[in-house]
Amino acid sequence: MATNTSTLNSTETVLRTENLNVYYGKFLALQNIWLDIPKNKVTAFIGPSGCGKSTLLRCYNRLNDLIESFRAEGKIFYYSKNLYAQDIDPVEVRRRIGMVFQRPNPFPKSIYDNIAFGAKINGYKGNMDELVERSLRKAALWDEVKDKLRQSGASLSGGQQQRLCIARAIAVQPEIILMDEPCSALDPISTLRVEELIHELKEQYTIVIVTHNMQQAARVSDRTAFFNVRPTETGGRIGYLVEYDATESIFNNPKQEDTRDYVSGRFG
């Protein structure tokens, strides 16, 4: 049975997941997820491959809707709004809840246009030069690219490209930034820079990060959710939440034996 210590004291809950079940066709991928995401904190999702971490992450900004066989039961609230209500526009959800993917994926455009493109699509009417600079500064990239804004985003190093993607997400003024293993394709120095950036960003944004790196989860997050997977009689695999608590508790004093085994490296 999952341990979900989701009482967040005075911290406001920005995303609330209630009794969520996720299906791909007839296949149950995630079962009975209850989870609160606190505002202006970093929440890490950890667990073995196939346990549904990225699936849940993509439920938050409705990217899974793009998969024809996807179906969700239960509710996910963004404040008081059910994100899966019929009157909710998925495009607006994705503006408010941004996404940074596993591998850097800059648009085939200039550094400047990588930032400006999404803002233009979303009807931004302000000073575009100021928005580009502000977004790049927030992503700790401005000083490195300010003299080459018209160069291709693809000309940057891998770590710079990932920070460009973070700046691109920031430019459309989201409240939440989802990160799906954002450092898995980066070298250790670039990884450290992104981790430092995550600490800075949580002052203004709520961040949810999926990571297979236990040390990274311990370093960057305030709360950690551990997911596991169990086999079915038909050969399938169902992901479920084992334990959710303050990161320090998950790593130093977990309540569930499976959590203790995973964070200590006994399985996974």
Curated annotation (Swiss-Prot):
Pfam families, per database record: ABC_tran
Q: What sort of enzyme, by top EC class, is this?
A: translocase
Q: What GO biological process terms does the UniProt entry carry, in alphabetical order?
A: phosphate ion transmembrane transport
Q: Which GO terms describe its molecular function?
A: ATP binding; ATP hydrolysis activity; ATPase-coupled phosphate ion transmembrane transporter activity
Binding positions (ATP) = G47, P48, S49, G50, C51, G52, K53, S54
Q: Where is the ABC transporter domain?
A: 15-254
One cellular component term (GO) for this entry is: plasma membrane
Tell me yes or no: is Transport among this UniProt entry's keywords: yes
Q: What does the record give as EC number?
A: 7.3.2.1
Q: List the catalytic activities from the record.
A: phosphate(out) + ATP + H2O = ADP + 2 phosphate(in) + H(+)
**Cellular compartments annotated:** Cell inner membrane
**Is Transmembrane helix one of the keywords?**
no
Highest taxon of the lineage: Bacteria
UniProt cross-references to InterPro entries, sorted A to Z: AAA+_ATPase, ABC_transporter-like_ATP-bd, ABC_transporter-like_CS, P-loop_NTPase, PstB-like
Which keywords, in A-to-Z order, does the entry hold? ATP-binding, Cell inner membrane, Cell membrane, Membrane, Nucleotide-binding, Phosphate transport, Translocase, Transport
What is the recorded membrane topology of this protein? Peripheral membrane protein
Q: Describe the family membership recorded for this protein in Swiss-Prot or TrEMBL.
A: Belongs to the ABC transporter superfamily. Phosphate importer (TC 3.A.1.7) family.
Q: What does this protein do?
A: Part of the ABC transporter complex PstSACB involved in phosphate import. Responsible for energy coupling to the transport system.
Tell me, how does this one assemble?
The complex is composed of two ATP-binding proteins (PstB), two transmembrane proteins (PstC and PstA) and a solute-binding protein (PstS).
Q: Which NCBIfam families match?
A: 3a0107s01c2
Listed name of the protein: Phosphate import ATP-binding protein PstB 3
Organism equals Nostoc sp. (strain PCC 7120 / SAG 25.82 / UTEX 2576)
Per the UniProt record, the lineage of the source organism begins with: Bacteria, Bacillati, Cyanobacteriota, Cyanophyceae, Nostocales
Source gene? pstB3
